[in-house]
Amino acid sequence: MLGKIVKVVVDRPLGSVHPNHKDIVYTVNYGYVPKIMAGDGEEQDAYILGVDVPLSEFTGKVVAVIHRKNDIEDKWVVAPENLVISKEEILEAVHFQEQYFDIEIEM
């Protein structure tokens, strides 16, 4: 999946609040990749990095996969095709939500 170009439908834009956990504010755009099913039986979730404005959809490259060791699903990290990003930058960007999980980042 790494390196693949995908379209993400953003259902939780930058600055929005988690629908079930009101203390979680999305510091990045977050959504799903239509027609790609994840381990939880829902469409594949994705963080969008490298874009600092709220979006409704985005097409970009899968630059990393966040494996949740203590959960049944992985999260994709999607970014503009030419963006160079480190594991540390990804960890910092997704910490607002991934801090509750034991994760490993594949790049």
Annotated model-derived regions:
Residues 1-107:
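Hydrophobic N-terminal alpha-helices or hydrophobic patches in metabolic proteins across all domains
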